[in-house]
A protein has these predicted regions:
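Conserved RNA-binding domains used in RNP assembly and mRNA/RNA metabolism
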Residues: 2-82
């Protein structure tokens, strides 16, 4: 199964890159899983100052938009996580 790596703009104005998976959930519960999200600006793990987790549940209503990353950003991200 191929991973879906996207650049994600959150309602908080944060831009992250990572794998995103849609998951089934009850109404009002988080319905997306972000796997190994990194801040786009400095390619550092998202929320690294606050947690050691690398998977996060997030509600889709916190996502403004998603896009395919530029090839150089994707390459740099994949080098960081592997």
């Amino acid at each position: 199964m191929s991973k879906t790596i996207k650049v994600i703009l959150l309602t908080s104005s944060e831009k992250v890159i990572g794998e995103i998976v849609e998951v089934g959930s009850e109404i009002g519960e988080p319905d997306c899983k972000l796997i190994k999200p990194y801040e786009v600006q400095n390619l550092a793990p998202w929320m690294e100052d606050h947690t050691d987790q690398n998977e996060f549940m997030i509600s889709s209503d916190k996502i403004i938009t998603m896009a395919d990353p530029k090839s150089d950003l994707l390459k740099n991200y994949l080098e960081k996580i592997n």
